[in-house]
Amino acid sequence: MARGIFITATGTDIGKTYVTALIIKRLRETNINCGYYKAALSEAERRDGKLIAGDANYVYNIANIKGDPNDAVSYIFQQAVSPHLAAKLNNVEISMERIKKDFYSIKNKYDYITVEGSGGIVCPISTGKEKIMLDNIIKIFKLPAIVVADAGLGTINSTILTLQYMKEKNISVKMILLNNYNHEDIIHIENKGYLSDNLLIPVYTCNKNANNLEIPVEKLIEIYEEI
């Protein structure tokens, strides 16, 4: 039975892909067969007439995953917009059946699977024939989640609002990870302290431009659940 986790964030460009890559890298360095999946990806680069799934490509390179990164993403769009809008612009109908098929195909290849979301937690994936929100994908695969937040000013508000939404959707949050953390920045220190003191969820940090996570691998293994 495979084990899985979902990586979401308090907003766009917080560092989900960066953190996702470091988590998978950490596990794979300890000989854990960990893979990657993303339902929909925007802002893909076109090379030689082919769209390249940039986020997946980054994760595969950092975590040393073999194979074609495009195979880890169900829907790849060039426009730098939300998946639902990209689908509209390209006349594409996003299907939960295809997402499920691709997810289970990836899942069958790995013992651990790390699923990356799109944007923040409130993200429409499809507003076409099927109405799909990001939380629908999390729940259909029964995945627990990690919330990535920026360490700086405003993160207390955005983190707590994100957690409240996820609680309403009955999504289990296993960890908060403050990205771009500076151990000498008083705001970062205070934010971590406040969240740690007022939440029942463990709060970890990731230093800016870090090549590795400081989180013990045992802690990472613990938060992945059977799926």
From Swiss-Prot:
Family annotation (Pfam families): AAA_26
Localisation per UniProt entry: Cytoplasm
Superkingdom assignment: Bacteria
Reactions it catalyzes: (7R,8S)-7,8-diammoniononanoate + CO2 + ATP = (4R,5S)-dethiobiotin + ADP + phosphate + 3 H(+)
Binding residue positions for substrate: S42
GO molecular function, one term: ATP binding
Catalytic center residues: K38
UniProt keyword list: ATP-binding, Biotin biosynthesis, Cytoplasm, Ligase, Magnesium, Metal-binding, Nucleotide-binding
Protein name: ATP-dependent dethiobiotin synthetase BioD
Species lineage: Bacteria, Bacillati, Bacillota, Clostridia, Eubacteriales
Gene name as annotated: bioD
